[in-house]
Amino acid sequence: MELNNKVAIVTGAGRGIGKAIAVSFAAAGAKVVCTARSKDEINAVAQQIDGLAVPCDMVDEQQIRELIDATVSELGPIDILVNNAGAVARLPVHELPTEEWDNVLNVNLRGVFLCTKYALPSMLEQGSGCIINISSGAGVVGPANRSAYAASKHGVMGFTKTLVAEYLMQGIRSHVILPDATVSQMRSEGFPTEDPDSLIQAEDIADAAVFLATQRATAHTLELRVSQGLRTRTL
């Protein structure tokens, strides 16, 4: 098994992409910590994969610290962190409430920063680790009516590049996945008439995450773009 006994945290693991990544990591042998706000959802996933469920709100710094502490206490040093939890607001800029802008940025960008900040000491202590951030096609373009989402995902791209600059020489690889439109509850709520056959599957993104988490991925693989019927590796 490619991830045998690796300790992995997956945020937003209760459904969609996060759930698919958690399931695939467990199938590859990892010891997976599933985290999200919904206790029922992550408990169900953790039971399915024999993992650990730790409820956590990505806007609560103390809860994130407790997530990291619980992981190290229960399973040992952290090998892999997948920052997947996300939020979206679909309104034009002039109609977007400031609190909705703040929430999207807090979950999608500040949450990524906080999880990474508190997971890094464990990785630095053992001299190795892998951080996988889930961005989006919106991280390279500016889709209409999703300004906060696009800004946050652009931020994830820049943050990941900085992680490479700061920690690669200390044995910690940092990568970012940019999925195109994916079958998920969040997607169906925003685009209820969209044909799901035109979208990629969460399992495709999970496959990319497993690849990045293993030694098959080199430190020079910064980005993976997952598209319908095509995967492109950007070096």
Regions found by a protein language model. Give the residues of each.
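Conserved glycine-rich cofactor-binding loop
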Residues: V7, G14-R15
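Conserved glycine-rich Rossmann-like NAD(P)H-binding loop of the short-chain dehydrogenase/reductase
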Residues: A28-I42
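C-terminal helical subdomain
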Residues: M169, V176-I177, S184, P192-R233
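Substrate-binding pocket helix/loop in short-chain dehydrogenase/reductase
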Residues: P92-V93, E100-L105
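The beta1-alpha1 cofactor-binding region of Rossmann-like NAD(H)/NADP(H)-dependent oxidoreductases
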Residues: C56-L67, T98
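Active-site helix of classical SDR
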Residues: T116, S152
